[in-house]
Amino acid sequence: MNKKSPDTEKVSNYDYLEKMNTFELLSNINKEDHTIAENVKKQIPSIEKLVDEIIPRIDSGGRLFYIGAGTSGRLGVLDASECPPTFGVSPGIVIGLIAGGDTALRNAVENAEDDTNQAWKDLQEYDISEKDVLVGIAASGTTPYVIGGIKDARNNGIITGCITCSSGSPLAEASEYPIEVVTGPEFVTGSTRMKAGTAQKLVLNMISTSVMIKLGRVKGNKMVDMQLSNDKLVGRGIRMIMEDLNIEKEQAEKLLLEHKSVRKVLDAHKNERN
């Protein structure tokens, strides 16, 4: 029986791309991009199920792992790396792994994604356990590295989810909580760094942001736990304090310098009022 080809490998709706002028190229790429958010919207119920599994596990000391290869792996590493500065969590709470290791973040590592056993070896270096959650990311849903990792994790009692852009894929079938954002043919046939990659980034944003909000890492709409690692973020923290406490800039600067954290400033002020 012939296996179904991934949706991400379907032939582009456009042809003779090299004959288009620059405006036509940009307009057609943009036209395709307009379809992405609506396709993500269709998967909100599936995203919700996965998020609601992640929250209690991190709250109980567990972690969230992402695994992927190529663009998918890079997006997982990107999302994981943004959680500490944005939400003030330890770098070990959300962990992104890419087939081929950190070298693959900049340069393709030949055949790295074809090893079905390597992901589990990589995960074991972090002592992954049933307290954690593993999310596999693969546009086609056929990447051996990711499928192997998901299957091994599930066999060891670990909650698994996935983000894929092809329906009925082996990865989705292997995962307990599949998210299938079917983005259709790419503008450049098979170039999943385009629509599929954008869709995956949107879903990752939704997962990590909603998890951190539900874990109390946002107050109102503000990143009160963000790391004050540069002048821009210090300025943002000062503005948050000014707005929340209705005070002048000089006083806000003094409080932030004293407490080193927006949350600590706001909590201290709250305790004073009580």
Curated annotation (Swiss-Prot):
PANTHER family linked to this entry: GLUCOKINASE REGULATORY PROTEIN
Pfam hit, one: GKRP_SIS_N
Species: Christiangramia forsetii (strain DSM 17595 / CGMCC 1.15422 / KT0803)
Family: Belongs to the GCKR-like family. MurNAc-6-P etherase subfamily.
Purpose of the protein: Specifically catalyzes the cleavage of the D-lactyl ether substituent of MurNAc 6-phosphate, producing GlcNAc 6-phosphate and D-lactate.
CDD domains noted in UniProt: SIS_Etherase
Additional facts recorded: A lyase-type mechanism (elimination/hydration) is suggested for the cleavage of the lactyl ether bond of MurNAc 6-phosphate, with the formation of an alpha,beta-unsaturated aldehyde intermediate with (E)-stereochemistry, followed by the syn addition of water to give product.
Alphabetically ordered keywords of this record: Carbohydrate metabolism, Lyase
Keyword Nuclease in record: no
Pathway noted in the entry: Amino-sugar metabolism; N-acetylmuramate degradation
Entry protein name: N-acetylmuramic acid 6-phosphate etherase
Active site: 82 (proton donor), 113
Gene: murQ
SUPFAM superfamilies linked: SIS domain
EC number: 4.2.1.126
A molecular-function term among this protein's GO annotations: carbohydrate derivative binding
InterPro entries referenced in this protein's UniProt entry, alphabetically: Etherase_MurQ (IPR005488), Glucokinase_regulatory_CS (IPR005486), MURQ/GCKR (IPR040190), SIS_dom (IPR001347), SIS_dom_sf (IPR046348)
Transmembrane regions listed in the UniProt entry: none
Keyword Transferase in record: no
Subunit and interaction comment: Homodimer.
Catalytic activity: N-acetyl-D-muramate 6-phosphate + H2O = N-acetyl-D-glucosamine 6-phosphate + (R)-lactate
Domain SIS intervals: 54-217
Record's signal peptide: none
Any Gene Ontology biological process: amino sugar catabolic process
